[in-house]
Amino acid sequence: VLFRSQITDLTSFRNLCTRINEIQQWFRSRNISLEHINVGGGLGVDYYAPDEKPIAEFAAYFSLFNEFLDLNPGQQVHFELGRAIVAQCGSLISKVLYVKNGLNTDFAIVDAGMTELIRPALYQSYHKIENLSGQLRNDKLAYYDVVGPVCESSDCFGKRVELPSTQRGDVFAIRTAGAYGEVMASNYNLRGKVRCFTSADLLKEKA
């Protein structure tokens, strides 16, 4: 069953169950039994406030299917919840190469680009951007277009992003990059693959 993505209202999944039950009944009336039902993904994550609900409502999600989905004996249900599981687990960490002050727009040019996280360039998706260095300095806020170093006009992570006053060498975190980040990265313009750190790696280094 193909369903849309980024759903946070669980009522939509109840409606999906109703529709699947109708389709199931159509098959039953013709003595056709499906081995499994794949309900896809769809469970959304919050790109705008990644710290408010870092873990999706899995318990309520599975409970809903368990209650409302009318399965045949032995029939399996498959879920594809990749984004909901890993999106909030990863951030793209980048360093500011230059700050360019324009007449109307200030730019923060970082060393990461569309080659590392293509979602903003590909379909203008939003990712929260944080200036970790500026937060530590408690600097005043300003607006920046945050762009990468790839020679493409689409190499932009965000326009008019409100950030602490930014300077060369500042460290940025581009949030919710755990899904569709590294897996969609490329070597375009001879860009090398960036190193990926996991919490397990850090724990090993401390041991």
Regions found by a protein language model. Give the residues of each.
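Short, small-residue-biased leader/transition segments that mark boundaries at the very start
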Residues: 1-2
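Solvent-exposed, charged interface segments at domain starts and junctions
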Residues: 5-7, 103-104
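Generic signature of intrinsically disordered, low-complexity segments enriched in small/polar residues
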Residues: 6, 16, 30, 50, ...
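Active-site pocket-lining/capping segments in soluble small-molecule metabolic enzymes
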Residues: 6-19, 23-26, 111, 135
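Charged (often Lys/Glu-rich) extended helix/loop segments that serve as interaction or gating elements
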Residues: 75-207
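Acidic, glycine-rich loop-and-beta core segments that form the ion-binding/anion-interacting portion
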Residues: 14-79
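Short glycine/threonine-rich loop-to-helix capping motif typified by GTGT followed
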Residues: 9-16, 46-60, 87-98, 159-162
